[in-house]
């Protein structure tokens, strides 16, 4: 089977170049600093709205109608919500699996971030540092 897929970047892992409106009114350059520059209420509201509107069931239907058979979903290390101040997103991933099943699409889950960042870019969760491999707690 050939995989013909679409990347759903910017949905569950924020990347400022894709989702700049989420960062408006802050100096944050990445997902690490965004919740630290907003009130908890403002952060939760932005994330909740973004996750419910950025990718929807309609997108999965459209992806299938265009002849694709797979989606790639980047997820953060805090997907289960156990790493304050971040908000987990396992419910959204569960929805994605239901939609994919409904439209006959496969899913490739991409663990896209790790604590301390694996690459030092915004798509690693925090810009300017790359300390994941240097902290035994992060690697264990």
In which residue ranges do the predicted regions lie?
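N-terminal carbohydrate-binding accessory modules
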Residues: 1-68
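Substrate-binding cleft and catalytic face of glycoside hydrolase catalytic domains
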Residues: 58-140
């Amino acid at each position: 089977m050939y995989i013909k897929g679409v990347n759903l970047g910017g949905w569950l892992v924020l990347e400022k170049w894709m989702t700049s409106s989420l960062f408006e009114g802050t100096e944050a350059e990445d997902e690490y600093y965004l919740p630290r520059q907003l009130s908890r209420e403002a952060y939760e509201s932005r994330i909740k709205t973004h996750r419910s509107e950025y990718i929807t069931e309609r997108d999965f239907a459209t992806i299938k109608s265009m002849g694709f058979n797979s989606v790639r979903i980047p997820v953060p290390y805090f997907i289960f919500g156990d790493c304050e101040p971040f908000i987990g997103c396992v419910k959204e991933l569960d929805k994605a699996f239901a939609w994919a099943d409904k439209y006959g699409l496969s899913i490739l889950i991409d663990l896209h971030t790790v604590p301390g960042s694996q690459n030092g870019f915004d798509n690693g969760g925090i810009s300017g540092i790359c300390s994941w491999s240097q902290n035994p707690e992060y690697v264990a």
